Amino acid sequence: MKLKRMVVGLGERSYPIWIGGGIFSRLPEALQEVNFPKKIAVVSNPLVQSLYGQALADALQSSGYDHHFISIPDGEEHKNWTTLQTIYDGLIAKGFDRHCGLIALGGGVTGDMGGFAAATFLRGIPYIQVPTTLLAQVDSSVGGKTAINHPQGKNLIGAFYQPRHVHIDVDTLQSLDAREFATGMAEVIKYGIIKDKAFFDWLYTHREALQRRDTEALISAVKRACQIKANIVEVDEKEQALRAILNFGHTFGHAIENLSGYQTYRHGEAVAIGMMVAAHVSRRMDLCTADEVGAIERLLQVFDLPVTPPDYSLEAYLEAMQRDKKVQQGKLRLVLNKGIGDCLVQEIDAPAMLFAEALKQF
């Protein structure tokens, strides 16, 4: 049983992250370490519950935790008020109060919604993230962003609310289909592009081990991704400045998700395309070379990620991006890569021409 530990340092709201293979049974140990409440709601979807619900229930029960499952539908299209109401209803029906806790067991949708329910129920109850997808393990479970979608845009209703603990068992990644695994790799690759060229190169060197989901390779990749995100969150918890770089590829990616009705593309797939568009914009602004754009494209394609934007009009893309929550006073704030391993946030006054030129590259 391999276990790596790290801490997200946020003063009184600091919390540990455990990363390993076969560590699911050690969740009660982690709960005790952070003095988690004994009465727990486990928010999950039917598929994840069928895979891991019994193991979790056995571990909690054997350690004296009173637990209740609240089942919610999976999928980005269900990350809405109706599903949030289902969680509230379950908490109220089971008599939960401020001295109870919540575990979000599942992927990013479950983590975002479980976290937002915890942030808002009785003005806040403690929660723990147990992410079971690669995307959730390296992105949404770390940093305290919680949210639901609005018909006009993604994650428009949310709160910053840090978990007490994040419990990452990479063995859960063996159950993912190839497409779901790839969508998580998009976010892993993002960290290399924006902050760590050596990690970017490591991902390419270890591509075969990652593709076959070797436990050691997965632990190393997830740990480094979490370290990079934690270091950024520690400096800028609420995205006043530095944390915005985590949105590399996301402005255009969210536009793709919105225009496709959250149906055609998974989040990481949309972000992969968004990163390619951002890289071409960066190239147009002489922030990176054509070879570096090619290296980004090559690594994304290694993991079978899409790199070509869908055929929506430039006007549709611009309108969707203007609804992005990162727009300030009508100006787009784009994260652009400076080569590989560094980036900057750039306000774009006239995005139409820049994006028109970038889209011509596809």
Curated annotation (Swiss-Prot):
- Catalytic reaction(s) noted: 7-phospho-2-dehydro-3-deoxy-D-arabino-heptonate = 3-dehydroquinate + phosphate
Arranged from A to Z, the UniProt key words for this protein are:
Amino-acid biosynthesis, Aromatic amino acid biosynthesis, Cobalt, Cytoplasm, Lyase, Metal-binding, NAD, Nucleotide-binding, Zinc
Subcellular location(s) of the protein: Cytoplasm
| Cofactor(s), names only, from the UniProt record | Co(2+); Zn(2+); NAD(+)
Drop me one GO molecular function for this one: metal ion binding
- Write down how the cofactor binds this protein: Binds 1 divalent metal cation per subunit. Can use either Co(2+) or Zn(2+).
Which residues are listed for Zn(2+) binding in this entry? 187, 250, 267
Involved pathway(s): Metabolic intermediate biosynthesis; chorismate biosynthesis; chorismate from D-erythrose 4-phosphate and phosphoenolpyruvate: step 2/7
Class of the enzyme per the UniProt entry, highest EC level = lyase
Q: Which HAMAP family match?
A: DHQ_synthase
Q: What is its biological role?
A: Catalyzes the conversion of 3-deoxy-D-arabino-heptulosonate 7-phosphate (DAHP) to dehydroquinate (DHQ).
Protein name stated in the entry: 3-dehydroquinate synthase
